[in-house]
Amino acid sequence: MTITPEALALSGHKFRKELLQMPVHAMQETIQHMTVRRGIRYAETVGELTGNIDLGPYSETRIDNDGMNIKGRTLYTFLGSVVKKFSPNSVVKSIYDSAVTKGENLKSVDIALRVLSYLTAKLGGNLQSHIWDAKRNDSGTTSADLFNGFDTITASEIGANTISTSIGNLYEFSEAITASNAVDMIKAFCEAASELLVDAGQQVKLFCSPGIYRAYLKDYQATVGAIPYNTEYKKTVVEGFENVSFVPLYNKSKSPYMHLTTQGNMLVGVNQEGEEEDITIEKHEAFVLQYIATMFFGVQFESINKERLLVGKLFNG
């Protein structure tokens, strides 16, 4: 089956909205644990209201003059672009052969949409891979250069002393986490968190590498014995902290940090609305097409206050 450039271009135009949403759908493994903010074009100020108000014994003269403040943080989304040459026949053949094997009777419009969906989902997969370690580089060429990931933002805040042990939003591990000490180490980490973060009845997520999670499972088995372990093979919460759930992610496998926070504090910014974002197919050479995409993407912590976030800096020999 041959798909013409015109058919691909028509599908791109017809399904533009769905295709622009596809990179986000392709990131669900990670962003299901975060909060997606749509309609963010370049920047939006986020943050929280701070201050206090206290009810005391009745007084006609007492006035509380302490101010209420908004601690603002900026969620930046960066406009990214890609122009990818590809041979439509090779992609179509792969999709069509797979459909035939599954007994699907696909029409040309279905194949065209699947070609575009395949390429667009790849964009989302690469953004997901670098959601922690990406570092903005204006002259870069990859997803890792497009925006500042959560680990990059964390390192910048540590460098600015806005995340620190003295403030209470940083915990520094004194030794490596292994299968022999993971339970005690991670419990100590959670115990160091503000009680307003871990003891306020809200659901909290512990973002970590799969290696750390596996070490915890092994140590948990050795610590509690075979019977309890076998009845709950996948220990998904931290012992003693039933509201703290492990979130082991492949894209955090080389991360120097763990993050203890809530889903609402992890912001992922996209636009998906403006004219700047588009997905088109153009033909400039015989047998070769160009897939052209532009879209916004960025991440940010809504707050780095200790009541919302505790960063665990892993031991580095």
Where are these regions (language model features)?
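Short, basic/hydrophobic alpha-helical segments
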Residues: 189-198, 202
